[in-house]
Amino acid sequence: MSKVCIIAWVYGRVQGVGFRYTTQYEAKKLGLTGYAKNLDDGSVEVVACGDEGQVEKLMQWLKSGGPRSARVERVLSEPHHPSGELTDFRIR
C-alpha cells in the first residue's frame, strides 16, 4: 500500500460533541498520523496520513457521521502535503 495524506473539512454539528477525540481514537486504531482541529466557522479540520486503505477507512467513518453525538452534514477532502513530519495523531 502506498502512503497518502489528506486534509478534510467536516461540517455539521461537529464541535462540542467529542468529535475530535473520537476521530483521534479511530485514526490511532487505524495507525494514522495527523490531527483534528476546530475551526472558527464551526467545522473540524482533519489531516490524516498513512496507508491509503486506512486513510480511506477513516474517510468513510467521517462521512458516515463520526461519533453518535455528532451530526455530519458534509465532508470535503483533498490530497495534502504537510510541511513537517507527523508522528502521531493529535488534537489541535
UniProtKB/Swiss-Prot annotation:
Its EC number is 3.6.1.7. Disulfide bonds join C5-C49. It is an enzyme of class 3 (hydrolase). Keywords: Disulfide bond, Hydrolase. It catalyses: an acyl phosphate + H2O = a carboxylate + phosphate + H(+). It comes from the Bacteria. The active site is at R20, N38. One of its GO terms (molecular function) is acylphosphatase activity. Residues 5-92 form the Acylphosphatase-like domain. Belongs to the acylphosphatase family. NCBIfam families: PRK14426.1. This is Acylphosphatase.
